[in-house]
A protein has these predicted regions:
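Aromatic-rich carbohydrate-recognition surfaces in CAZymes
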Residues: 172-200, 204-307
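Generic, well-ordered alpha-helical scaffold segments in large soluble proteins
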Residues: 7-15, 143, 206, 210, ...
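Well-ordered alpha-helical scaffold segments within catalytic/enzyme domains
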Residues: 9-14, 119-132, 181-194, 252-267, ...
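Active-site-adjacent bridging/hinge elements
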Residues: 145-162, 225-233, 318-330
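C-terminal capping/lid segments that line or modulate ligand- or cofactor-binding pockets
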Residues: 1-30, 89, 231-238, 243-246, ...
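Extended ligand-binding clefts on enzyme/binding-domain cores
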Residues: 176, 215-216, 223, 232, ...
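Low-complexity, Ser/Thr/Pro/Gly-enriched N-terminal "stalk/linker" regions
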Residues: 108-177
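Non-catalytic C-terminal accessory modules of carbohydrate-active enzymes
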Residues: 1-108
Length: 430
């Protein structure tokens, strides 16, 4: 019954994208006219000029009035009435996004904000002064400081060094990827705010410590609390919140550290912990090239979500050792289908080159820097040889995942790194 109703409504140009959400989102209808009997009478859907050529919505009317929402509510549908689609040959943004009732400040009260930065507040005022769109101004003023307001926990370690733990939002755990991305927009303001610079230095220091605890983990607890999924096998260190191996868990700390160094000139974060972390990163990335054997890393979880665990007793699908690096999971924390995750391998190349620059200029670690460069060169060459596939319509494109045997996954994932985000990250030219 429910599926039948879904098919009927979708054929009329109304899609229930959110199960039980009470909204039907508009798409191209299949018919010129249809009538549906509802509790309030009859609901008529008319698609003027509908045809294979005129398949895009141009305007919508509901009960004789212009309608600017991209959806209709269940209650309105049940009342009965008439919905008219005017169709045309070209895509058109005909609707208006939902507007809030008032552009109210959504930030926590000042005394409840976790970290305060005068430079960030100044940047909010500067940018909002440039924006003429009230909605964009409201969004920026609330979103830009959100990481500082709600997720940053700044302190000092036993030696008095900055130590910053960053929640990933609604989960009280620190993802290496997320924390590197969350504080990234603030690095540009470090020179204006010494406290902000110390906070970000604390993020880098904490990331390096966490990598040295377990270079295969993607998320960590603030202390050895043992908080994690109790069905995971093998069980992880009490500091580890989740042990999903993702290449970008190494790349984001390197990207952040390099950007911080280039912006501030501060080298205090590149001490013994940094060098140890770089040894662990290179060792792990080489292990996951799987040139000699699959290695020791496995991940299993009791779950009803197929992509929340790995197949083949936690080892994932086999790969051919061609120089690329296996990522057991994607940035979405979903398991990879084919282990060589292409966007993450691209990010590994640029991140290793950035690390080599620091190791040479700051630490004088030329041998370790050379290892980073050699690994980056190898992966870069393998990407051009194995990550490029021939698409029947678009020609040569990058696959999302490959296995080295010839299999390829042609898709993209919403989180970053992704194929779409590679230019944003600087991993490929635009």
């Amino acid at each position: 019954g429910q599926m039948s109703a879904w098919y009927v409504l979708s054929s009329l140009g109304m899609y229930e994208a959110e199960p039980a959400g009470g909204r039907y989102w508009f798409g191209s209808p299949l018919f010129d006219r249809a009538e549906v009997t509802v509790p309030g009478g009859v609901f008529t859907i008319t698609a003027e000029n509908n045809s294979a050529a005129n398949k895009y919505i141009q305007r919508v009317w509901l009960n004789g009035q212009p309608y600017t929402k991209p959806w209709i509510g269940h209650a309105d549908l049940m009342k009965g009435g008439e919905l008219i689609f005017e169709m045309g040959p070209e895509e058109k943004v005909w609707y208006c996004p939902d507007e809030p009732e008032a552009y109210a400040d959504q930030r926590p009260a000042e005394e409840q904000r976790l970290f305060k930065s005068e430079a960030v507040e100044g940047e909010i005022a500067r940018v909002c002064g440039l924006l003429t769109n009230e909605r964009l101004r409201w969004m920026f003023a609330n979103c830009f400081p959100n990481t500082l307001d709600t997720t940053v926990h700044y302190g000092e370690d036993e030696a008095g060094n900055p130590d910053t733990y960053v929640y990933t939002g609604d989960i009280p755990a620190m993802w290496l990827r997320d924390s590197g991305a969350q504080v990234w927009p603030y690095v540009q303001l470090c020179k204006e705010d010494p406290a902000l610079q110390k906070m970000i230095a604390g993020v880098i220091r904490r990331q390096l410590k966490l990598i040295n605890i377990d270079p295969y983990a993607n998320a960590f607890n603030v202390a050895p609390t043992g908080a994690h999924n109790k069905t995971d096998f093998p069980q992880a260190d009490p500091m580890v919140f989740e042990r999903k191996w993702e290449i970008d868990s190494h790349c984001y700390p390197l990207r952040l550290a390099h950007h911080y160094w280039k912006t501030t000139g501060d080298t205090s974060v590149f001490g013994a912990e940094w060098v140890e972390a770089m040894h662990n990163i290179v060792k792990t990335l080489k292990e996951q090239q799987m040139k000699e054997d699959p290695g020791d890393y496995t991940f299993l979880r009791t779950t009803d979500r197929q992509l929340d665990t790995r197949c083949h007793v936690g080892r994932g699908n086999p790969v051919k050792p061609v120089g690329l690096i296996v990522s057991a999971f994607r940035p979405s924390d979903d398991a990879t289908t084919f282990g060589f995750l292409v966007p993450s391998n691209f990010m590994a190349v640029t991140s290793l080159r950035k690390a080599a620059e620091i190791l040479t200029a700051v630490n004088g670690e030329r041998e370790l820097a050379a290892e980073c460069t050699a690994l980056a060169d190898e992966v870069a060459g393998a990407l051009q040889q194995y990550a490029v596939v021939e698409h029947p319509e678009f020609g040569k494109i990058y696959a999302f995942e490959v296995d080295g045997f010839g299999s390829a996954q042609l898709m993209d994932d919403a989180n970053v790194p992704s194929l779409l985000a590679m230019p944003y990250l600087g991993d490929v030219e635009r």
